[in-house]
Amino acid sequence: MEEEIRKIGAEEIPYFRTPEFSALMKENESLMNRFMKAGEGARTVFLTGSGTAAMEAAVINLFTKQDRLLVVNGGSFGARFVRICQIHGIPYDEIRLEAGKKLTKAHLAPYAISGDLGQEDSGQEDSGQGDSVREDSCQDDSGRKSSGQDPSTQRYTGFLVNVHETSTGVRYDMELISRFCRENRLWLVVDAISSFLADEFLMEKWGVDLVLTGSQKALALPPGIAAIVMNERTVKRVEESRVESLYFNLKDYLKDGERGQTPFTPAVGILIQMNRRLQMIEEKGLVGEQEQIKELAEDFRQKIGELPFQIVSESLSAAETPLAPTGKNADGSPVSAYRIFEILKDEYGIFVCPNGGELAEKVFRVGHIGHLTKEDNQKLVDALRDMQDRGLL
């Protein structure tokens, strides 16, 4: 975190129902729209909550039980979209990917209306919220909702994807996804929580209807604020929707956002920090911010070339590098990725990001976002080399 941003966090929290705070919030919205390349008529709303809050809000404000969604599930956060659909009873099919594998045309082809992903479409049409959706779906043993029929005969209305599946470090091909959604007239919802600012994002060009991000990744702020950016047609759809939620009803956020406010008390301090951070990015330039992160990622990946790790992602984001240890312990057992995290934390004062679930012992992740330098990269590499010399890798 930048020192200037940290100092703002130490200041007293002001009362927020004021013209001054409203002006700050409207600037936050304007800059978020600009950095997402959202286009004319786009709106950004800010929720006090985690990225998961924004994921759930997006799904329940855009879709109902009369829709059928396609969900890319390549890891923990794709599975989170699946779980949201299950909880709210929204029919879905999931495209399951092996950890570390990229999304390809072959994965999408069975779900295409025409079965042909090779032709460009001139625009994205409104699919309608209840077009030709079956209601005889059942749930198989895996928890996946399915009608039991060939997926190519189903009428899908929406597509949910984490553009960067943070748990495995895979960045999906947005050009491919964009083309598929246009050809099949799907509402496109994108979680860009860990990708925003680290990788190029072209909301309007790609026909993304809604994109969400959080304060704690490349914005390098405390966790607690989620931003949801909607294009013009999504704003209209949200305003016409009926949502059975008080806190997650985005209609209220849109209405209050017109005057630079939120319907409920927000994390005021983080929003003030966000304002200065967005201004700093504007001063540096969006491309400059992205290039800095990219350079850090490339520098780290070059420096670890001789260490006993494998980069497990087929399609990397600049935000992080997912590493699988390839070494063996003295007893012949594989080196634990989680144990590497613990040793770095406890003995070297360095934090990398561990994984959970079945990847906990197999993969850890090194981030390149936030207030980091090439010297920080070198410090981590030196620690890993020392661990290697100690026989810990």
Residue map of PLM features:
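PLP-dependent enzyme catalytic core of the Aspartate aminotransferase-like
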Residues: 358, 362-393
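Active-site C-terminal subdomain of aminotransferase-like
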Residues: 1, 216-299
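Conserved active-site segment immediately N-terminal to the catalytic lysine
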Residues: 204-216
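Conserved PLP-dependent catalytic core of the aminotransferase class-I/II
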Residues: 31-35, 278-312, 343
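Active-site phosphate-binding strand-loop segment of PLP-dependent enzymes
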Residues: 103-121, 150-195
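Conserved N-terminal alpha-helix of the aminotransferase class I/II PLP-enzyme fold
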Residues: 8-54, 80-86
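Conserved PLP-binding catalytic core of the aspartate aminotransferase-like
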Residues: 310-347
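Conserved PLP-anchoring active-site segment centered on the Schiff-base-forming lysine
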Residues: 63-79
